[in-house]
């Protein structure tokens, strides 16, 4: 089972953190919460719906984005997008922008679309680990 304050879906535990951090700091924070903790990866439409609901229930502020664990890695033609937990992107809901390398759920779209945002901005975030 998941610890108290965490929500479960499938084989994973999730928690929205309202503290605002950069993508890197949020990923580091998630890794400190559990052995295989990371910013959330979203690997199916069902999981996307679950995460959207969780974020909507927890984030009431005017912050425009909530970090997820997706970041464009590498330079130029060698770019690949992968989740911070190492899983590859099979399910996606991306809005592209070449200069912004990290992804967040966009409040304006009710946290349903993934928009790329400058990684140094500070936003709330969602952590995930396998239970």
From Swiss-Prot:
GO molecular function, one term: toxin activity
UniProt entry keywords in alphabetical sequence: Disulfide bond, Hemostasis impairing toxin, Platelet aggregation activating toxin, Secreted, Toxin
InterPro entries associated with the record: C-type_lectin-like (IPR001304), C-type_lectin-like/link_sf (IPR016186), C-type_lectin/snaclec_domain (IPR050111), C-type_lectin_CS (IPR018378), CTDL_fold (IPR016187)
Tissue: Expressed by the venom gland.
Quaternary state and interactors: Heterotetramer of the subunits alpha, alpha', beta and beta'; disulfide-linked.
Organism placement in taxonomy: Eukaryota, Metazoa, Chordata, Craniata, Vertebrata
Matches recorded under Gene3D superfamilies: Mannose-Binding Protein A, subunit A
The organism of origin for this protein: Trimeresurus albolabris (White-lipped pit viper)
Protein name per the record: Snaclec alboaggregin-A subunit alpha
Function: Potent platelet activator that aggregates platelets via both GPIbalpha (GP1BA) and GPVI (GP6). Induces a tyrosine phosphorylation profile in platelets that resembles this produced by collagen, involving the time dependent tyrosine phosphorylation of Fc receptor gamma chain (FCGR1A), phospholipase Cgamma2 (PLCG2), and LAT.
Covalent S-S links between cysteines: 2-13, 30-127, 102-119
Superkingdom as given in the UniProt entry: Eukaryota
Family: Belongs to the snaclec family.
GO CC, alphabetical: extracellular region
Domain C-type lectin: start-end pairs: 1-131
PROSITE patterns for the chain: C_TYPE_LECTIN_1, C_TYPE_LECTIN_2
Primary localization: secreted
Subcellular location: Secreted
One Pfam short name: Lectin_C
